[in-house]
Regions:
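C-terminal regulatory
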Residues: 1-95, 124-128
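A late-sequence structural motif
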Residues: 88-128
Length: 128
C-alpha cells in the first residue's frame, strides 16, 4: 500500500521523502536500537520525525502492513509475511547481541549443546 502511493526509495537520501513509524521511547525493546533507520544517512544527531510511534515490534509490523509508513523490522518477524517489502537491501542494520545463559554445570550436557546449536542455526540467519 505505502510503496504504491509514495514510491520505493532507491538510495538512503531518498528516505527523507518518506514517512516513518518508530518504536516509542520508554517501551522495552527486544532488539538494540530499533529506530536506527530514523538516523540512517543523516549527520550529527539529526533524526527523521516519525508519523507514528508504537510500543512493540508487532505494532511496527501492523502499522507497516496498514500503509502508515516505513519501519526497521527484524527478519524474524517478517519472514512469513508475504506483503512486506525490504527497501534498500544493500543497507545493513545494526548488530544485536544475544545471550544464552545456563548453569556452568550443564555446559557439556547433550540437551544444552543441542539447544545451543538449534538457537545458533536460527539466530545466525536473522537480519535487522
Amino acid at each position: 500500500k505505502y510503496l504504491e502511493q509514495y514510491g520505493h526509495p532507491k538510495t538512503v537520501s531518498e528516505l527523507n521523502k518518506h514517512k516513518f513509524i518508530s518504536y516509542g521511547r520508554g517501551a522495552p525493546s527486544p532488539v538494540f536500537n530499533p529506530d536506527w533507520a530514523l538516523k540512517l544517512g543523516l549527520k550529527d544527531s539529526k533524526k527523521r520525525k516519525p508519523v507514528m510511534k508504537v510500543n512493540s515490534v508487532y505494532g511496527l509490523l501492523l502499522a507497516v502492513q496498514s500503509g502508515v509508513g516505513l519501519a526497521a523490522l527484524p527478519d524474524y518477524i517478517t519472514v512469513s509475511v508475504p506483503n512486506i517489502v525490504k527497501v534498500l537491501p544493500q543497507v545493513e542494520g545494526p548488530k544485536t547481541e544475544a545471550y544464552f545463559v545456563y548453569p556452568q554445570s550443564l555446559k557439556d550436557t547433550a540437551r544444552i549443546i543441542a539447544f545451543r546449536n538449534f538457537l545458533y542455526s536460527k539466530v545466525s540467519k536473522w537480519e535487522f
